[in-house]
């Protein structure tokens, strides 16, 4: 990362620091505040007393006056903070929530303190006589007690010591102009006499002792009051965990630590540009007992001013820390440790007697310039020679061994990294025993600990932890990783393996090496997964090492041998597998990454104890991959820059089954996953750690959830995410709702809900915490021996690959760090820039000596999400709760599961050839095959795409242009793109620059997604497993069908209840659905009985159709607008401009092999009595579709297929229902879908041929014939005969005003085109060839009636009817008119009231009352029958049982996905809900039912007010008063703090009507809020959700991401409004555009349909002409 970013962070931190200081001054003297009344002062005093008492309860041992004074100071700060954050006096004095508010305030102050530690500048004065380098900017770099550093470098519990200034003005982009001058800056400052703010140290230190007592006796940190060395012997009692999770020192102590003790550990003070190659002082100051973070404890000083009692030549002096050294107390004998490199470092010792204090000035810059130590006169000649040559050779005399640096000129900057990386590791070696001779390692990291906030520390370490040398050749040659000469962070000096002489003769080193691994890991995990492949390559002699406990000698010796073997394996590997030690990231993105040793069993050996240093990294790797599995953020949106790259790796693993895959990190990662899945060892240092890690997270998460409501009340913002409530005192943004993407990821995400906690954002505001785990919850001290550092990486499932393109986007998860987030690799074996990926499997190794028993004592994040995310093994191993309903298999009995598997391998729906091919593949099943269907690779059908401007379908493999505009992606065909002469192309009325378009080929292919069993690790297709990726919120354990059968048979589990996974029967029933079901079941029973009678069998012996469910899944009120040109012709005749109607969608489900499969669907339009003529009381059967999977596949008595019988009965039942409700007619257009397109159900099976028009028409007529027999249908005719001709005694006027006007029908669109052509012809314009046929309309037909003036509307009407008749006549039989009531033969109206006058002699003649009156007044000649002498007598027949008004008693069922057939089809296409095979039809139907049971707008689905997770139907609890307060079951069970009563949300099965009404109310409320927002000008409007909607709209105006969660919410709201809006001047953003967009899409679809029909007619005419003999 560029160093300029560090400077930016510094500035924000400095500014924030002043704010905190100001607040402190105010809070410390509350009575001095002007303008506060005496009563208020008394109230505040009362609150101060209560706060003091609260603190005293937690400090029972502090009874002396000094301690009380310190507690009083802390109480003042807390009271002042609560006063500032309270919104009202009542809120301030609410003692019911006092405890929670205090705790919340502590957390907030913690964020400020960590971001703004007390600066040492105020306690320093300039050293007289020393040049200060005026003009330079000095950076305060407080020293940090890193015992609280977790493994992500999070300063969770940091106490700080300040006392350094370093000039930063000469540091830019990783270079240092004057290192010596900058390093000497600290020496120019001395402490201010008499200023000591360490008075409060013991108050906070006691809290630290209390909280971290569970860490097994962690050494006390630096503090001015700890002068007695005996304190170091005291170990805290185990098991003590403060419920708060934070001690006072953790939260406020940073500003009260002593500033007197300077950097006694000899670490380099560096500026905020952490990682600059300033390692010149990386020579140890002294060997003294130290705290676990490398900070010298004050207990090591007898007196502050006691002079050094060690020979000067034994002191490892850094001139930067010369002042600190001179003040240090008694020092033990010191050793100078040399530098260690990243690729094969050697730890050696140097006789300190050979060096003098005077030489240290040269030592300061030697590592930066490679000249300092060479000029040291006291350095032994052979050691100096070794150092100059960079040869890391182990000397026989251990005191004379010095780790050496490669001296190649191009690698000189990497030498700086060597000090950093290895001394940083040595630092932890000294943390084992307070009385052990420590070997402190001075390194760059300890300088970074002096930064003002933990984020800076993260950046510094991440920079140099990622930037490293990459092995470029198998011969162990290393190339230099340079990026424009910008090196951020110290970089490792490369050392070839030939320079490393491994020997198992140094077992004492091993334990310390383990500690190095721990410290390296604990300080670098924020860099993600840092491979430590070279940690086993240490060279040392046991003479040099500090004594270690005897009981570990044997194991240490074993480790030494293992390191040697590991190193050999590494050096024998190929170039892509050579091992290096340190990971670095150069600013421009180049990356060199180590690789695991060659060998298939490497990982298993590591996990079984062959590589002790691997355990820590294995955990880190798993945790990082678990985050990657869950993260749904886009490539540039995730907090982790490497997240997207890791997704690429996991996506590769998705398909990879090669035993020795050459893809980088694939093979090793799979091995680790395999072990993790099968590990049952209770002492496994990798698996047990993760399990215990979860348990501790649960405890912390429980506490935080209880504190949540109070935190929210302190900040008075809308609903916020948990992390922002906990860490920021300036929170006012609404937490994003969790939005489900329509398309689940191809691989199951085995992670749980997104974290409600945060990692520190190293680049943001110090108080800002990104989605992840709070740094405050990763506080963990490094304990002695068995200490386990906290793995910061959220435990995320790593064993299952996932799609890199996860939409939905939409859910952020734990970022591993801010620096190891740079994408490193694409689908290649090398990185994106030709370098290796940072996700090296070598990083999967950990030290074995970390005992499982200590894992329970880790005070790491204890959030529930970590527990949920670790769904890696079965419940018996991982202890996590199972989420029911992730797979439909859970409903099945073992017999049903076996039936399902057998059905999968039958490939029902495919052609015979394809089915046989797949069956043959199943016989040769490989390890890469699905364990259920036995086939490996299955691809979905390509989704059809259409040109936005012209609506033409883009052919397969054809080139086209695409662009994202608005909320959707648009496609432009080549002709339309070329026709746009300008530099823009019009897309939905918006000009889009051609430069934004991307040229693509329509050849995209999407493979089916996979899922892995948590028990047997077998892989299956998600479709085969009936896996619902939408229900898997990353928290579900999945058991494959085979393991499920075993568990059921062994009694370990039972099939879940049907209420867990709601099916078709659980959908709300309606009057219509009940009518259809009852009638269908009755008819099926009769048919089955008749079949049994004819076959001579009993009823049970004859197969019958069962398990059928019919439901109305959409029923919404709509308005059909008449097209403008047509309306202009009949405006004078009071023709209605719009027709209200109700659109309904009806689906039929049948349970096949245990799954309810959608087999049939139809959309209808019902125009009731509220519609004007000619649409009044009419029904339009707009679309009908079915798939050929109905069971049983038998014939009825009449010889037709049983499925045809069922579908006919549904239609007849619907017509019967309409007739009883008062509808008079039904209109059917028998038009099959276009080739390659579908009406409702997406992608039909190959065994089902698309019917020709005549076949489809016959199918409808056969149904109507049955309906006529049952007297449901009165008469059938066709559209042309009924409206276009006057046959018989018909006296109705032939006019287009009589034609029923339906949405999507053929003639309205055709009429509009004809009228447009007529107008163009009249104006002399050229006809539009695309819209009209070539034939020119003639006026001859009008001459006979004398209508020659086309400007007259009547003439236009006649001409339009004439032309329409010509078009419709060839296919008039396809437009079927069904009369449900009798039709008057004179006026052609359908009679629904009064009497109908019937002629007994004529079979089908009746007239209405009105026409009968006219008939009686006619002359005898014109009476019925016309042109006959004998006149017939007409008899009246009363019309009854027809409602005068049509009312629909069914509830409105509104759904975004089922609003129209196009919306439903788009849902299926976008998510690949296909019906081409039965196996896919089952899965698609399962997903359709999921959407049906979750009908609310996705962006505004109910979310838990505490954890922000989306609540599914029938889940959670809600407040009876607050409309927006809903909580999930998990949060409710842990206790909530809400003033009102909470009730359970009703389930779909318990209260279908209530749920339906609730959904409609919610949608109506949202529409009302949006309309209110358009007129609201109040900033603090109290209208419900007003500010939320305003925030969404503001976000949409500035968002550059396009497609984020907030944008999806905004667009969903706009669509919800636009579907119901009819205001032509609506001011809601995008309303008119959306309506125009939908209308345009519908018109294009209708145009394609009409064009196909015309083509079919022409083809039919051509065939007829060709077949006619001459």
UniProtKB/Swiss-Prot annotation:
Binding site for acetyl-CoA: 1184-1186, 1203-1204, 1259
InterPro entries registered for this protein in UniProt: CBP_P300_HAT, Histone_AcTrfase_Rtt109/CBP, TAZ_dom_sf, Zinc_finger_PHD-type_CS, Znf_FYVE_PHD, Znf_PHD-finger, Znf_RING/FYVE/PHD, Znf_TAZ
Residue numbers binding Zn(2+) 2: 1399, 1402, 1424, 1432
Annotated Basic and acidic residues bias: 717-734, 842-863
Record Gene3D superfamilies: 3.30.60.90, TAZ domain, Zinc/RING finger domain, C3HC4 (zinc finger)
UniProt region (Disordered), positions on chain: 490-554, 709-765, 830-863
GO cellular component, as recorded: mediator complex
Keywords carried by this UniProt record: Activator, Acyltransferase, Chromatin regulator, Metal-binding, Nucleus, Repeat, Transcription, Transcription regulation, Transferase, Zinc, Zinc-finger
SUPFAM superfamilies: FYVE/PHD zinc finger, RING/U-box, TAZ domain
Catalytic activity: L-lysyl-[protein] + acetyl-CoA = N(6)-acetyl-L-lysyl-[protein] + CoA + H(+)
Enzyme class at the top of the EC tree: transferase
Zinc finger (PHD-type): 970-1046
A biological process from GO: regulation of DNA-templated transcription
Ranges annotated as TAZ-type zinc finger: 611-690, 1554-1634
Tissue: Rosette leaves, stems and flowers.
Zinc finger (ZZ-type) boundaries: 1379-1442, 1499-1550
Domain CBP/p300-type HAT: from-to ranges: 1061-1497
Matching PROSITE patterns: CBP_P300_HAT (PS51727), ZF_PHD_1 (PS01359), ZF_TAZ (PS50134), ZF_ZZ_1 (PS01357), ZF_ZZ_2 (PS50135), ZINC_FINGER_C2H2_1 (PS00028)
Positions of Zn(2+) 4 binding: 1519, 1522, 1538, 1540
Molecular function, one GO term: histone acetyltransferase activity
Superkingdom of origin organism: Eukaryota
Role played: Acetyltransferase enzyme. Acetylates histones, giving a specific tag for transcriptional activation.
Protein name, as recorded: Histone acetyltransferase HAC5
